[in-house]
Every structure is written in structure tokens, then in C-alpha cells.
Amino acid sequence: MKETPLSNCERRFLLRAIEEKKRLDGRQTYDYRNIRISFGTDYGCCIVELGKTRVLGQVSCELVSPKLNRATEGILFFNLELSQMAAPAFEPGRQSDLLVKLNRLMERCLRNSKCIDTESLCVVAGEKVWQIRVDLHLLNHDGNIIDAASIAAIVALCHFRRPDVSVQGDEVTLYTPEERDPVPLSIHHMPICVSFAFFQQGTYLLVDPNEREERVMDGLLVIAMNKHREICTIQSSGGIMLLKDQVLRCSKIAGVKVAEITELILKALENDQKVRKEGGKFGFAESIANQRITAFKMEKAPIDTSDVEEKAEEIIAEAEPPSEVVSTPVLWTPGTAQIGEGVENSWGDLEDSEKEDDEGGGDQAIILDGIKMDTGVEVSDIGSQDAPIILSDSEEEEMIILEPDKNPKKIRTQTTSAKQEKAPSKKPVKRRKKKRAAN
């Protein structure tokens, strides 16, 4: 399923807001979205939320044979999956260009930077080493996947504990967590990716772009850095030309953001370890009980509306007060009335019922003036409006027509019994034939 394209109005609105240094969620140019880290019950499982972008990280390990050219080093493997649950545009089971690019960037950021001591993963040189596998699943896509994935990967690696082993001769003994405490991985530093989106050919810059901003950006710059301000990798995409000053400015901003995120990660790991030692609730169990994972709510963004309120007050002060409109019904004639403004509402005039007589089988219309009918319809004082009209329970159809005159005096009624009472006598008309004189 292809993603829904942006309309021209949405595109122009986003670009105009960026030119005015405004964002849809109320952030400033260099602001990051709120980051939340949750840990699972087992070691090495975590969920990282970057705004509405959610990534699940899971680390696993197994004993395998090492590579031939690196007999004393362990193996580190990364796998990022984009499912349709995150966005309908992602196709399952297909290696898209975006997925390949993200996986390669993760490998350069974490594996090539030597953030993990792979030699400590060796059990028996040339025979047994630990293979560490990091699986990342995108749960919801709202932009900036690489930043959320890098944070989830490094958090899961820091939180992971591998089983302890012992080697006696040719025998390798693997201990369960009940027998011996698991051993954490040896991590030298924590590289974190920071993304910068460029607009209008590098004129405008935004940190941590969301999904809508990514669709209108001209280029993307990703800088992976640790808290020691050591650049691990840099990647530029989009085909834009960046100046040296722009790259240096982005590196300075990335250094500040990485320091803040690293402090947040260390604090989250410390709190989780403290809760586990105390024996309290930890992991997703506590989050599900409080409906923190299953419930999705909109975050409140602080937005300054003072300028808009002042402008609205000025417009209201300069505008003329609205006129009071009172709608009262006006009685023009006993049969007509007008409510509000517009076309008058009145009783409709009815033409002579000649056509109805033909359709009704030749029934005649009888004009009555204050008489009593045999059919059960009593009309006494027609000029008075308060006089009631009494109808009988006769099975014959009865119809009373009201005229819009001020003092209606005639009522036309049509019944089937009237034909029997006053049926006009029709006499045959004889015509004389004239004889022509014979020539």
C-alpha cells in the first residue's frame, strides 16, 4: 500500500511554517521530542518512545563458531524491521531501500565504532564465541526512525546480561541465572544518532524531524556521536550541498543533544536496577497495569498564543457591534402568517375542481352557505373563526377547503352522497335534420 501523498496546500503550509520558525507540535528549531524508556521483565528488552515513534529492542545471544579471520572476537549482528503495524506504506518481507539504508547506518554507528568490546565475547579462541543479536522492531512511525532505533539499540545492549560460562579443558559449562548471576556486556561508549533536516536547499534547519517534515525536506544529515564529542559516523542524503560551517554547527548541536540523551539513559538504567534489587514491580508489567503502553494520548505542547489573542481583541474592538434580530410571527390575515425574514408562509389557493370532478367519477362541487349537510358536516357561522367543525364517523371521504380571504364565506366540499341528492337531470337533445331540396 502506497503512502498517502501530501497535497499542495499541506506542503505549502509546512514550508511556510518552517520559514516562520514554527513547527506543528509547538517545538522550537533545535528541540527534541519527549523521550521515554521502558524496560521489559527480561534483561535486554526495552521500548523507546521518541514522541509518537516507538521502537522495541530485544537482545539475544548464543554460542557459535567465530569467523576465520577473527578467531578471538565475538559477533555483533543488528536487524531492523519495518512492519505494517508501524505504517501502512511498509511492505512486509521485502527489503526496501529505506530498510537497507537504516540497517547499514546502524552497523556503522554501533559495530564499526567499537562501542562494544568484542574480544570479551570470546570463550574459546577459534572454537566458541558469543554472538550478540540486536533485533529492532518499529511499532509506530512518526518520523526520525534512525534516532529512536539507535537509542533503543544502545539501551538494550546496556541492559542485557549474558549467561556466565566456565571452561575446563575442552568442556564449556553454561550456567543458568539461578546458578550464577548473568554478566553484563563490556561497553566502552554509547554512540547516539542525531538527525538534522534541511529545507529550501539548506537555508532552514530542523532537529528531530517528524513524519510530515520528512516528506517535505530537501536533505537529511545524520551525525552519530558519544558524550565525549567523538564523531562515530556522518551520513548525508538527499543530494544537497552543505557548507563547512553548516556541518560544524550541526556537530555542536549534536554534542549537546547526545549529552542530554546519555544522561537520560543512565538514569533510566539506574532506576530499573534499583527497582529490581528492591523486588518491586518493574518492566512492562507496571506499565500495562497503569495503561501506559496500550493507551495513546496527545501530548500537551506549550504554545505561545499571546500575539494571536491580542490581535483578536483588536479586531473585536474595531468591529461594529452586531445588530439585534428579534423574530416574531406577524399575522397578516386569518389564513396567513410570517415568521422571520424570507418568503411569506400562507395557505395555498386552490383552483376550480373541475379536473378533480372528472377524476372522481363526475362528483359535483356543492357551494354551501351556512346550511346543514346530510353527510354529517355542520357549518354554522363560517365568518367566525372560533366556531368548531364537527365531523362524523362516516366512511365516505370528506374534504374541507379553506380560502385565504379575510372573511371566507364559501366552503367547497366534495362528497359522494351529494351526487345522489342533487344530480342534475340530463335530457336528450333532439336535432332536426333539414332536408335538402332536390334539384
UniProtKB/Swiss-Prot annotation:
Task performed by this protein: Non-catalytic component of the RNA exosome complex which has 3'->5' exoribonuclease activity and participates in a multitude of cellular RNA processing and degradation events. In the nucleus, the RNA exosome complex is involved in proper maturation of stable RNA species such as rRNA, snRNA and snoRNA, in the elimination of RNA processing by-products and non-coding 'pervasive' transcripts, such as antisense RNA species and promoter-upstream transcripts (PROMPTs), and of mRNAs with processing defects, thereby limiting or excluding their export to the cytoplasm.
A GO CC term attached to the entry: nucleoplasm
Ranges annotated as biased composition (Basic residues): 425-439
GO molecular function terms listed in the Swiss-Prot or TrEMBL record: 3'-5'-RNA exonuclease activity; mRNA 3'-UTR AU-rich region binding; RNA binding; RNA polymerase II-specific DNA-binding transcription factor binding
Keyword annotations of the record: Acetylation, Cytoplasm, Disease variant, Exosome, Isopeptide bond, Neurodegeneration, Nucleus, Phosphoprotein, RNA-binding, rRNA processing, Ubl conjugation
Primary gene name: EXOSC9
Similarity comment text for this entry: Belongs to the RNase PH family.
Family matches, as CDD domains: RNase_PH_RRP45
Keyword field contains Endoplasmic reticulum: no
Disease: Pontocerebellar hypoplasia 1D: An autosomal recessive neurologic disorder with onset at birth or in infancy, and characterized by progressive axonal motor neuronopathy, severe generalized hypotonia, respiratory insufficiency, and cerebellar atrophy. Death in childhood may occur.
Keyword RNA-binding among UniProt keywords: yes
SUPFAM superfamilies attached to this UniProt entry: Ribonuclease PH domain 2-like (SSF55666), Ribosomal protein S5 domain 2-like (SSF54211)
Positions of region (Disordered): 335-363, 391-439
PANTHER family: EXOSOME COMPLEX COMPONENT RRP45, EXOSOME COMPLEX EXONUCLEASE RIBOSOMAL RNA PROCESSING PROTEIN
Compositionally skewed regions (Acidic residues) per UniProt: 349-361
UniProt modified residues of type N6-acetyllysine: K297
ARE binding: annotated segments: 1-268
Assembly mode: Component of the RNA exosome core complex (Exo-9), composed of EXOSC1, EXOSC2, EXOSC3, EXOSC4, EXOSC5, EXOSC6, EXOSC7, EXOSC8 and EXOSC9; within the complex interacts with EXOSC3, EXOSC4, EXOSC5 and DIS3. The catalytically inactive RNA exosome core complex (Exo-9) associates with the catalytic subunit EXOSC10/RRP6. Exo-9 may associate with DIS3 to form the nucleolar exosome complex, or DIS3L to form the cytoplasmic exosome complex.
Residues in cross-link Glycyl lysine isopeptide (Lys-Gly) (interchain with G-Cter in SUMO2): K297, K419
Protein name: Exosome complex component RRP45
Main location: cytoplasm
Glycyl lysine isopeptide (Lys-Gly) (interchain with G-Cter in SUMO1) cross-link site: K297
UniProt cross-references to InterPro entries, sorted A to Z: ExoRNase_PH_dom1, ExoRNase_PH_dom2, ExoRNase_PH_dom2_sf, Exosome_comp_Rrp42_subfam, PNPase/RNase_PH_dom_sf, Ribosomal_Su5_D2-typ_SF, Rrp45
Localisation per UniProt entry: Cytoplasm; Nucleus; Nucleus, Nucleolus; Nucleus, Nucleoplasm
GO biological process: exonucleolytic trimming to generate mature 3'-end of 5.8S rRNA from tricistronic rRNA transcript (SSU-rRNA, 5.8S rRNA, LSU-rRNA); immune response; mRNA catabolic process; nuclear mRNA surveillance; nuclear polyadenylation-dependent rRNA catabolic process; nuclear-transcribed mRNA catabolic process; positive regulation of cell growth; positive regulation of transcription by RNA polymerase II
